[in-house]
Amino acid sequence: MNQDKVFENSLEKIIPDNIEIELKTPNSTVAISEQYQNNIDTQKIWQIEIPKINLVAPIAEGTSANIMNEYVGHFAETPKNKGNIGLAAHNRGYKINYFRDLKLLQKGDLIIYTYNGEISKYSVNELGIIKDTDWSKLESSSQDKLTLITCLEDEPEYRRYIQAVKL
């Protein structure tokens, strides 16, 4: 079976029959029809955007190595749309390091969080370093906020955190 056919078969598993696509080669960009682009289910988009560091990243449930090798991970113990939403990602040493520039954020910087079609804006209000055993920044809260956590370079027992409050 040639490479184009293998690629085409794998697409059949993720693109419904009623969607028109143009397939050139497995190494080219697949041109998806305008009909498909207009029908993308915005209810399923889950992402974080941080304009200051040019970050737009998908989010997935969990913080396992497998999840964080492809996504920003969501701490399952935290809510997804209200209260204190906890997210984690790598900042170096992996194929995908979404939080590599998190250290550049400052108070007042904008973070845009999209979940279930709802877009929420947050403003950074707290930045700091915590022990890797300190989970207090992820505690439940009646205030809507995002907590971003990543490793601290060359200090494996510490974590960098950013908290942002909903605007």
Feature-to-residue mapping (PLM):
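Solvent-exposed, non-transmembrane regions of membrane-associated and secreted proteins
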Residues: 1-167
